[in-house]
């Protein structure tokens, strides 16, 4: 295991996840998450929206999930590997001296939310709808809060994670999914059915 992988594991540790390339999608078989009603916005996203208000009031024209193709999956794999390799994992406390700062990793360092923001930005620039690129808060097997990017497709929901270069169906990650951005408004969040109270700070 190289030093970059070790750093990623120290910043956002997830037990049992291998950091290797690949598409974890047997026969493209996956399901979509079942979401509930509106819920609290993570405090880090709330502060991010104050800094980038234009990014938090977008209402995508189409709410249909992306069509799952080999081309889309290659795009997801390429962006995942590129961002994971280009950003050095570092905690908000080490970077900013405080917790829960969501920011683009333009200086080449960041924590799990920052990887998510960058992947979302890059995929959006390639034409993937923001309705299909959803910042998502999960709980890891050890109970710690974590953030990943959910990609909605007509073949199910897939996850891009800074802890692995694989693109996995959401229900094969081992995480408990708690909340994610609403598909119809980038500034709103919805609960995910079956989740529990999030450990990441939220605006109540």
Residue ranges: model-predicted function:
Residues 2, 26-204:
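A structural boundary/capping signal
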Residues 2-13:
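Bacterial N-terminal signal peptides that target proteins for export
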Residues 12-22:
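Bacterial N-terminal signal peptides
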